[in-house]
Amino acid sequence: MISIATTYYNRRPQFINTLRSLEISKVKDFEVIAVDDCSDEDQKIDDLEKRFKFLKVYRIDKEDKWYHNPCIPFNIAFSLCKGDKIIVQNAECLHHSDILIRTEQNLNDSNYLSFANYSIDEDTTKKISKHEKIKEFIDSYPMNDNRFDFYGNGVNGWYNHGIYRPCAFHFCSGITRKNLIELNGFDESYANGICYDDNEFLYRINLKGLKIIFEDDFKTIHQYHERVNYIKDNSTHLEAINRNIFNNITQRRLSYKVNNRNVF
């Protein structure tokens, strides 16, 4: 079984598009664990469990949120996963290719699969929902003709690609349950800042000796979304917190396992 672990906040139309893209996979034995990280009432996704039977939603209430970084809700998602293979991804990343079947066939305990991720702008994102069948959009979007590197937020370009931007961050990636347990999820010392959670996770994947495989022929699409308001106002300070942790603590680690508690 494959588990897809994701965190979600105020991007309901984009997430519905992602779920629609999963419906057309040849793989049927999978689940989506989505941790709703205090979304507004009109953006909640609990009702989508009836429409998408593979979806399981865990909601965090606003009074229980003490952190800024998604490492906390991601670790909650990991703890709820039942699959022996886990896809770690953002809620807004729809599957342009059959990521599930590639994960089923190629993921093992010695590797980490990094699926290509292409960013689309706001106008293109709005057009997706107009397609009655998500495959119509997937088949019509000429991603292979757009080979320039990503150069800003909300524009068309590669977020992750083995040739054009090989960062291997978890826009959409595959890792076995065994390896994720041994890593013990994301490092929760990053909870009070923003960014660098992806850097630290990748650093420990390398430290563990997993082979990073860029799956450029298996693509995902990052749909446009606005930044969280409180992060907009305080981003410089919050990013500095985690940059300091990464530079002065993470990069001096000798062990790939983190946290003082077992995530699983």
Question: PLM features: what roles do these ranges have?
Answer:
Residues M1-S21:
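N-proximal low-complexity "stem/linker" segments adjacent to membrane-targeting elements
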Residues M1-S3, E31, E200:
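Cell-envelope/extracellular polymer assembly enzymes that use nucleotide-activated donors
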Residues R20-D29:
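Short, acidic, metal-binding catalytic loop of nucleotide-sugar glycosyltransferases
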Residues D36-I45, K62, C93-L94:
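A conserved acidic beta->alpha catalytic loop
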Residues E63-C81:
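Glycine-rich, basic loop-to-helix element that forms the pyrophosphate-binding segment
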Residues F78, H96-S97, I101-N184, E188:
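Conserved catalytic core of nucleotide-sugar-dependent glycosyltransferases
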Residues G83-H96:
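Short beta-strand-to-loop acidic/aromatic patch adjacent to the donor-nucleotide binding site
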Residues C167-F169, S189-F264:
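C-terminal catalytic/acceptor-binding lobe
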